[in-house]
Amino acid sequence: MAVTSKAKMYAQGLQFYYGDFKALHDIDLTFEQNQVTALIGPSGCGKSTFLRCLNRMNDLIPISRVEGVIALDGENIYDPKVDVVELRRRVGMVFQKPNPFPKTVFENVAYGLRVNGVKDREYLEEKVEQSLRHAALWDEVKDRLQDSALGLSGGQQQRLCIARALAVEPEVLLMDEPASALDPIATQKIEELIHILKQQYTIIIVTHSMQQAARVSDVTAFFYMGRLIETGATEIMFTRPRNKQTEDYITGRFG
C-alpha cells in the first residue's frame, strides 16, 4: 500500500477479531488530510467495526483484538505507549443516534473541555460559541444555552454532538451514520456541514445511503464480508467501478 505525504491516517494489514471470529481481513486504507471518505457496504460488512478501530472504541469490547497497524500522523495508535484518552480527543466520534447528555446546551459542549481541566469561564464561553458556530447551530441555540439539550430537535441534537466533538479540537472526525435517524431537512444540514468541516478536519463517515456517499465524499471505500473490496475517488467509484461486486452493490443488486 502506498501511503502519500498527505496521509493523515492509514490502516495497513489490519485484522480485527471478536474472540475467534475474524471480522476484518487485511485492510489497507489511507485517509488524506481535509478529505471526506465514505465507508459503504451492506449491514454486517465490517465498516462500523473498522471505523471504531480508528479511535480504539473497540478496546471497550473485552474479547476483541487487533493485528496490523493504524497510524495517525505516522504513529501507530495501537502502540502500548499511546494515551487513549488523548487519541480520542484527536480522533473524535459522532454516533448514529444523537446522544446529548442530560445537561444544558452549554454544558454539553463544555463537557470535554472541563474533563481536560479547563476552568476559565471566559475561555469556556469562547470555545462553546466557536464550536456551536462551526456546527452551524449557534444562531438556533444562542438564546437557549442554559436550557436542557434534550429539548432540542433530533437534527439540532446531532449538530450539538458534532459541536461537542469539535470543542476539544480534534484533527479527525469519525461519523457513524450521523443522519440515519434524521428527517430529510436535518440530513441536508448535516451534509452541508460536512462540506464546511472538511476545510479543517479529515472526515470518515459510515453511511448506508449511496446518495449521501455520492454527495458528501471525495473518496469511497466499499466493504463486503469484512474485506475492503475497492476504494477510489467517489465520482469514479459511482460511475466506473472496477469490481463487479462494487457495481452490483452501488446499483442495488444486493444490499
From Swiss-Prot:
GO CC annotations on file: plasma membrane
Q: Which SMART domains match?
A: AAA
**What are the recorded Gene Ontology BP terms?**
phosphate ion transmembrane transport
Whether Nucleus counts among this entry's keywords is no
Q: Where in the cell is it found?
A: Cell inner membrane
Recorded GO terms, molecular function?
Answer: ATP binding; ATP hydrolysis activity; ATPase-coupled phosphate ion transmembrane transporter activity
Gene3D superfamilies the record matches? P-loop containing nucleotide triphosphate hydrolases
Keyword terms, alphabetized: ATP-binding, Cell inner membrane, Cell membrane, Membrane, Nucleotide-binding, Phosphate transport, Translocase, Transport
Q: Which Enzyme Commission number(s) are listed?
A: 7.3.2.1
**Reaction catalysis annotation:** phosphate(out) + ATP + H2O = ADP + 2 phosphate(in) + H(+)
Enumerate the spans annotated as ABC transporter domain: 9-250
State where it is primarily located. membrane
Membrane topology field: Peripheral membrane protein
Residue positions binding ATP: 41-48
EC class (word):
translocase
**Keyword Membrane tagged:** yes
Tell me, what's a Pfam family for it?
A: ABC_tran
User: In UniProt terms, what function does this protein have?
Assistant: Part of the ABC transporter complex PstSACB involved in phosphate import. Responsible for energy coupling to the transport system.
Quaternary structure note: The complex is composed of two ATP-binding proteins (PstB), two transmembrane proteins (PstC and PstA) and a solute-binding protein (PstS).
The similarity comment for this entry is: Belongs to the ABC transporter superfamily. Phosphate importer (TC 3.A.1.7) family.
Q: What is this protein's record name?
A: Phosphate import ATP-binding protein PstB
Species name: Nitratidesulfovibrio vulgaris (strain ATCC 29579 / DSM 644 / CCUG 34227 / NCIMB 8303 / VKM B-1760 / Hildenborough) (Desulfovibrio vulgaris)
| Lineage summary | Bacteria, Pseudomonadati, Thermodesulfobacteriota, Desulfovibrionia, Desulfovibrionales
Coding gene?
pstB
